[in-house]
Amino acid sequence: YIIKETSISSVIKSVALKNKDDLIENDIELDVKVNDENVLTDSKWLEFMLNQIINNSIKYRNQDKKACIKITTEKIDEKVTLSIYDNGIGIKKSDLPQIFNKSYTGDNGRKVAKSTGMGLYIVKKLCEKLGHKLDVESEYGKFTKVQITFYENDFYKF
């Protein structure tokens, strides 16, 4: 891992460009409202994690309504929280405690052909290695919100 000050907005722009075709093809609105916060992380792995989360938002969108993915940041004291919210099909309450388990696909994953159950597992492991906190909140049939919290850490400042 290469931990250094990283611009969240530049990583989001890169991820948006990578997913541009899928977002357009599936008529998904991407609403980005982020302050240009710098966080201590590995930019390559942050991009990988955001890509996984956005791919899940695209994969599990609600076909019955206009899909929207909202990305925001909030800085409170010594931490920055990056939130990725979608109005997709959500995650069943019974599946939520297991979504970070290796190979766990849940009820939604069993309905989608390209689900391996590895995406959130890897994202969780990367957050642990990088010292970030990962939270997922969801209401089945309504939304999913994934939050990555970055802490200011003097350990990485040489």
Predicted features and spans:
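Conserved micro-motifs of the catalytic ATP-binding
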Residues: 1, 34, 38-42
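Short helix-loop "hinge" at the ATP-lid/N-box region of the Bergerat-fold HATPase_c
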Residues: 57-61
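Glycine-rich ATP-lid/hinge loop adjacent to the conserved G-boxes
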Residues: 63, 104-114
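Short beta-strand/loop element within the Bergerat-fold HATPase_c
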Residues: 66-78
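Acidic ATP/Mg2+-coordinating residue in the GHKL
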Residues: 86
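Short conserved segment of the HATPase_c
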Residues: 91-103
